[in-house]
Amino acid sequence: MLEARDLYCERDERTLFRGLSFTVDAGEWVQVTGGNGAGKTTLLRLLTGLARPDGGEVYWQGEPLRRVRDSFHRSLLWIGHQPGIKTRLTARENLHFFHPGDGARLPEALAQAGLAGFEDVPVARLSAGQQRRVALARLWLTRAALWVLDEPFTAIDVNGVARLTRRMAAHTAQGGMVILTTHQPLPGAADTVRRLALTTALVLYALRANIDLFYTPGEILYGKRETQQLPAVGQRLRVGGMVMPGSVRRDPDSLKVNFSLYDAEGSVTVSYEGILPDLFREGQGVVVQGTLEKGNHVLAHEVLAKHDENYTPPEVEKAMQENHRRPQRVDKDTSS
């Protein structure tokens, strides 16, 4: 099992992610998604030990990665955005370099990758897509349990993507693990791949079965704009919205507090037990992390606020722009 625990990463004085926690068990594969600059490649480098996080830890089989680096790397196949092959060698020679004991299997691996007839052509004479296939032919040779692949389908045609996806599915069916970044759909695998969506500067969690991680109140009520899919009761999620004026109710004998979050589409109720951020204010934007309960209620385990009286969570702002309006300020709780 690979585990990311409370990962925090900054680049160029910008927070890419913080509090990022998830696990990848035997037989699972995870697709990391996000816009340019969201930190997808950086996350993969942290997971493979090629870079160190600014906070948090990566664990392999229950042990900190830094303590079991050698055994981890024996279990890892890493193919980065660049093919990582030697252009002066042929396709066959490149595979032999990585898999010297598998000479008899090299032609079949290259054929599976779509390179039949190109085995002895110098890689420098191959197209970008063919060079990528040389690197990906290792998927038919490696005995590594964990595959971490950064944009593996770059310059690969539709048939090649389908063939590679089938290979990944076979690997996970045999108990392997796959983590990849890609903007392309995974033919035949949409129901089995977990998606982890990175949104700059937010705490993110890997959820099950292709559910986006962030919701606005309106999306909880009516579903995502693209799919109309509602979050499931019991699902861990993040909700960003404005704290409804007049909705905050504090228990005088404990740290329990209830309030409502709203956007232009509606409102949801939130309960939380703990110390609220100093910057928590009615009428201002916050992001809560928690679990969705019945009745569109969120049981929160963390509340985040930002030092800006005009702050609106970025995802809420985007949703409002798509709807051509911002959330209206309200004077009372209208969630009931």
UniProtKB/Swiss-Prot annotation:
Q: What is its EC number?
A: 7.6.2.5
Which keywords does the record carry? Answer: ATP-binding, Cell inner membrane, Cell membrane, Cytochrome c-type biogenesis, Heme, Iron, Membrane, Metal-binding, Nucleotide-binding, Translocase, Transport
User: Per the record, which residues fall in region Cytochrome c-type biogenesis protein CcmE 2?
Assistant: 196-336
Q: Which GO terms describe its cellular component?
A: plasma membrane
Q: What class of enzyme is it?
A: translocase
Q: Which Pfam families match?
A: ABC_tran, CcmE
Q: Which domain of life is it from?
A: Bacteria
Q: Name one GO biological process term.
A: cytochrome complex assembly
Which is one GO molecular function term here? ABC-type heme transporter activity
Residues binding ATP are: 34-41
The record's region (Disordered) falls at 307-336
What reactions does this protein catalyze? heme b(in) + ATP + H2O = heme b(out) + ADP + phosphate + H(+)
Query: What are the ABC transporter domain coordinates in residue numbering?
Result: 2-242
Q: Where is this region: Cytochrome c biogenesis ATP-binding export protein CcmA 2?
A: 1-199
- Protein location: Cell inner membrane
Q: State the InterPro entries in the record.
A: AAA+_ATPase (IPR003593), ABC_transporter-like_ATP-bd (IPR003439), ABC_transporter-like_CS (IPR017871), ABC_transptr_haem_export_CcmA (IPR005895), CcmE (IPR004329), CcmE-like_sf (IPR036127), NA-bd_OB-fold (IPR012340), P-loop_NTPase (IPR027417)
Q: How does it sit in the membrane?
A: Peripheral membrane protein
* CDD domains named among the record's database cross-references: ABC_CcmA_heme_exporter (cd03231)
SUPFAM superfamilies, alphabetically? Heme chaperone CcmE (SSF82093), P-loop containing nucleoside triphosphate hydrolases (SSF52540)
Function per UniProt: Part of the ABC transporter complex CcmAB involved in the biogenesis of c-type cytochromes; once thought to export heme, this seems not to be the case, but its exact role is uncertain. Responsible for energy coupling to the transport system. Heme chaperone required for the biogenesis of c-type cytochromes. Transiently binds heme delivered by CcmC and transfers the heme to apo-cytochromes in a process facilitated by CcmF and CcmH.
Q: Which NCBIfam families does the entry link to?
A: ccmA (TIGR01189), PRK13150.1 (NF009635), PRK13165.1 (NF009638), PRK13538.1 (NF010061)
What PANTHER family does this protein map onto? Answer: ABC TRANSPORTER I FAMILY MEMBER 1
Give the family per the record. In the N-terminal section; belongs to the ABC transporter superfamily. CcmA exporter (TC 3.A.1.107) family. In the C-terminal section; belongs to the CcmE/CycJ family.
Q: What is this protein called?
A: Putative bifunctional cytochrome c-type biogenesis protein CcmAE
Organism, by scientific name, is Salmonella choleraesuis (strain SC-B67)
Provide the taxonomic classification: Bacteria, Pseudomonadati, Pseudomonadota, Gammaproteobacteria, Enterobacterales
